[in-house]
Amino acid sequence: MAEAAEPASALPLSGSLFTHHPGPPHIMSAVICGSLAYDTIMVFQDQFKNHILPDQMHILNVSFLVPAMRREFGGCAGNIAYNLKLLGGDPLPVAAVGQDFAPYRRHMEQCGIRLDGVRQFDDQFTPQCFITTDLDNNQITAFHPGAMSSAQENHVRDIPQVDFAIVAPDGRQAMLQHVDEFAARGVPFIFDPGQAMPLFNGDEFRSMIEKSTYVIVNDYESQLLQTRTGWDTAEIAEKVSAYIVTHGPRGSVIHVGNETHAIPPARERRIVDPTGCGDAYRAGLMFAIMRGEDWPTAGRMASLMGALKVEHPGTQNQHFTYAEFAAEFRDQFGYALD
């Protein structure tokens, strides 16, 4: 793991809209716009290449026996909310779900996560992803958006108290609408286009960035965003309070005005499943911003959340308390959270 390049306590949280709250977690309400989805994950005990003939792709018709299968609770809104709750936050997912939501509802209720922002459409299914992985870790994925196609019927303008928010991947119209409504209310929020990148053109991206408080993408998405908008990293950064770019196992970079904070990756004890690490990172970042942490600390908190997630299968199966998180943070980065 790369060593911390700068003492976190020495740098201010430029662009923060929140007062620093030392001591135990200061609970603030965070609205999480995005999807709640089921992830059905299957493992094919062979290699796809042994069953697909390259010269017969025009008549592709294959079937794979998958003796191993598991169903996980997922979706960006669900994953972020789950991780934020672990830290002691108060997440409110805003999402559209379908007639089969009951098991997920019970899971959220058991976690103590509020569901008054979740709207159920009984004539549709909850969004779901079907992933088949072979022994080379190649994947064939099918995604059914289901009720997510009606997510624009959820209006964040009607939520009575919102301290902070994130607009994560969701239905196209819902994302445009939620950005507009948060901006109109003056609510600070993170714009997280993620897998929804193909849904928007350059004009739409430029408009959403200019209305956002923060923007977060991974390194590949950052290149796409620059291509679509015609803006380079510095130009995007000057339009928001912070522009965060994650680089997987290489850490992340937080651009704040003319400042650049290189965030080292946290150490993981074992690598089990990277799925959902980005959502865990976002939860850690949101929690740190709401606590008024400086950017180097915020980035490290986010990085540690991602590392703790990678040690477990699925996206919502890790368990720890804030005290355990804070102790691990001190062990890894050499200083204590206030």
Residues covered by each model-derived region:
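Conserved phosphate/ATP/ADP-binding segment of small-molecule kinases
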Residues: Q177, A183-I190, G194-P264, R270
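Conserved phosphate-binding/catalytic region of the ribokinase-like
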Residues: G230-D338
